[in-house]
């Protein structure tokens, strides 16, 4: 039987992030990938130059036909662009009871740049995030969701706990990257019972565009394959590290991960 995963996110014309990264990740996990497009960007490795949302009726139609016919085994959300899109997506997820749900709360880039407005952030917090099986904020998104400043590992832990108790999400995976006082990358897992730190070797590369998208997509793919939540996160972290180690040196800026690294020819 073929497992099916669904990504609800935006398009990256450079192929490094968004649904392009998600579908590559699904394919690498031998999961059939389906997609609902929420916005289109004119994007290269050096930045985003233009973006337009998909009209709400078409977003609804995409979710309806995929959910009714293909019945995804797991779902992830990424860039939802504005509050109207967030509301539409939330309503359809509820209508079809689509779970497990990985919510990548795309609000702030990994460098700290805001990606959606305050109204959309509030909408995300009030409507979509409470449905999440697992929520995967980066450091800056965790600061917004918790109201806490994060400069070290202990503060990241406190933020994860605060987000859990305020958000309604079943599990928080707060992504710390390389924080002060640490030589490794780390994420914090909190499920209301135990708090765990996941360490990984740091990969030094400028070709890291789409890292967050790839992680949430890999978690989603593992869930679709029937792995439990913790093992899905562990497997996804390993996959992202290997994809970073085999990232692609393309374009003038931040290139993409090597999603298909076992298939890549060595130089």
Language-model features: locations:
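Conserved N-terminal subdomain of the carbohydrate kinase-like
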Residues: 2-7, 27-103, 107-110
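Short pre-catalytic strand/loop immediately N-terminal to key active-site residues, enriched for Gly-Thr
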Residues: 8-14, 195-209
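N-terminal basic/disordered segments at the start of proteins
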Residues: 15-31
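Short, small-residue alpha-helix embedded
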Residues: 20, 143-144, 205-229
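Phosphate-handling active-site elements
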Residues: 30-34, 195-196, 222-236
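Charged C-terminal helix
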Residues: 53, 230-267
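Nucleotide and nucleotide-moiety/phosphate-recognizing core
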Residues: 87-96, 170, 189, 194-195, ...
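Conserved phosphate/ATP/ADP-binding segment of small-molecule kinases
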Residues: 118-195
């Amino acid at each position: 039987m073929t497992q099916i995963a669904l990504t609800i996110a935006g398009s990256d014309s450079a192929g490094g992030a968004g649904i392009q990264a998600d579908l590559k990740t699904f394919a690498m996990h031998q999961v059939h990938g389906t997609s609902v497009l929420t916005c289109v960007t004119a994007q290269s490795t050096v930045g985003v130059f233009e973006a337009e949302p998909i009209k709400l009726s078409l977003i609804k139609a995409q979710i309806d036909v995929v959910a009714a016919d293909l019945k995804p085994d797991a779902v992830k959300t990424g860039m939802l662009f504005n509050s109207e899109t967030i509301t539409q997506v939330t309503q359809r997820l509820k209508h079809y009871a689509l779970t497990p749900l990985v919510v990548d709360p795309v609000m702030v880039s990994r460098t700290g740049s805001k990606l959606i407005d305050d109204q959309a952030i509030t909408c995300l917090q009030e409507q979509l995030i409470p449905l999440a099986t697992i929520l995967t904020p980066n450091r800056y998104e965790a600061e917004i969701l918790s109201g806490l400043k994060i400069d070290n590992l202990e503060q990241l832990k406190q933020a994860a706990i605060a987000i859990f108790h305020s958000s309604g999400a079943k599990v928080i995976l707060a992504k710390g990257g390389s924080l002060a006082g640490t030589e490794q990358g780390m994420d914090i897992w909190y499920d209301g019972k135990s708090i765990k730190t996941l360490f990984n070797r740091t990969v030094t590369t400028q070709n890291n565009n789409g890292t967050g998208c790839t992680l949430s997509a890999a978690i989603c793919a593992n869930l679709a394959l029937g792995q439990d939540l913790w093992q899905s996160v562990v497997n996804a972290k390993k996959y992202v590290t290997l994809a970073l180690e085999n990232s692609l040196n393309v374009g003038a800026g931040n290139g993409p991960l090597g999603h298909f690294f076992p298939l890549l020819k060595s130089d």
